[in-house]
């Protein structure tokens, strides 16, 4: 069975990917603790590629990397590729973002997820992107999810990601949409392998 290393130290992302990948014939593993890849790209896709190729080379197996983030219209697209580094912790990131929007009437935002699967030789096997439109709430709502999930209300649902069960988040969310594009390509790669 092919090993696929999730190129992330984020426990929430790892759990989400393990759930999304559970029905595929893959041995899904987290990247080794303490291995960190500097995200120097200017786009989500570039950062996903940087992480996937570095982790695949280090682990000697395929690696799946995600770079995702939140872009808020009223903030000129910020926090964008700096979403994870906008402040030190999830609660501080939420507080900082809500503070930046305290007087804003325009609260539209978009989550983007770029996924990349790379091989140990550095080749990129798959690259896809998924997006989800919504807006930033004035206060956190819900106990699920991670990151900005409690303050991102998904368009046409009335719910934040933190209020959604994983199945609903998968169908509406940026990562789920990206995964829907990635999954058939990953299945094709797996079925093309010699047995």
Swiss-Prot record:
Catalytic reaction annotation: XTP + H2O = XMP + diphosphate + H(+); dITP + H2O = dIMP + diphosphate + H(+); ITP + H2O = IMP + diphosphate + H(+)
Listed cofactors: Mg(2+)
Binding site for Mg(2+): 38, 67
Organism this protein belongs to: Parasynechococcus marenigrum (strain WH8102)
Gene3D superfamilies in the record: 3.90.950.10
Cofactor binding note: Binds 1 Mg(2+) ion per subunit.
A biological process term (GO) from this entry: nucleotide metabolic process
Gene Ontology cellular-component annotations: cytosol
Annotated CDD domains: HAM1
Protein name (Swiss-Prot/TrEMBL): dITP/XTP pyrophosphatase
UniProt binding sites for substrate: 8-13, 68, 146-149, 169, 174-175
An example molecular function term from Gene Ontology annotations: ITP diphosphatase activity
Pfam assignment, any one: Ham1p_like
Role played: Pyrophosphatase that catalyzes the hydrolysis of nucleoside triphosphates to their monophosphate derivatives, with a high preference for the non-canonical purine nucleotides XTP (xanthosine triphosphate), dITP (deoxyinosine triphosphate) and ITP. Seems to function as a house-cleaning enzyme that removes non-canonical purine nucleotides from the nucleotide pool, thus preventing their incorporation into DNA/RNA and avoiding chromosomal lesions.
The protein's assembly and partners: Homodimer.
UniProt keyword terms in alphabetical order: Hydrolase, Magnesium, Metal-binding, Nucleotide metabolism, Nucleotide-binding
Source taxon at top rank: Bacteria
């Amino acid at each position: 069975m092919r090993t696929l290393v999730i190129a992330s130290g984020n426990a929430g992302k790892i759990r989400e990917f393990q759930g999304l990948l559970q029905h595929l014939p893959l041995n899904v593993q987290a990247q080794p603790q303490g291995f960190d890849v500097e995200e120097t790209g200017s786009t989500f896709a570039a950062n996903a590629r940087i992480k996937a190729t570095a982790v695949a080379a280090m682990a000697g197996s395929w690696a799946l990397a995600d770079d995702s983030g939140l872009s808020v219209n009223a903030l000129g697209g910020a926090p964008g590729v700096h979403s994870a580094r906008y402040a030190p912790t999830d609660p501080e990131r939420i507080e900082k973002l809500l503070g930046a929007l305290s007087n804003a009437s325009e609260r539209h935002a978009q989550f983007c997820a770029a996924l990349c699967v790379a091989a140990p030789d550095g080749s990129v096997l798959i690259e896809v992107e998924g997006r989800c439109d919504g807006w930033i709430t004035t206060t956190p709502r819900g106990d699920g999810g991670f990151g900005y999930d409690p303050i991102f209300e998904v368009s046409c649902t009335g719910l934040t990601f933190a209020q959604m069960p994983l199945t609903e988040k998968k169908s509406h969310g940026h990562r789920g949409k990206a995964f829907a594009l990635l999954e058939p390509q990953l299945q094709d790669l797996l079925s093309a392998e010699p047995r």
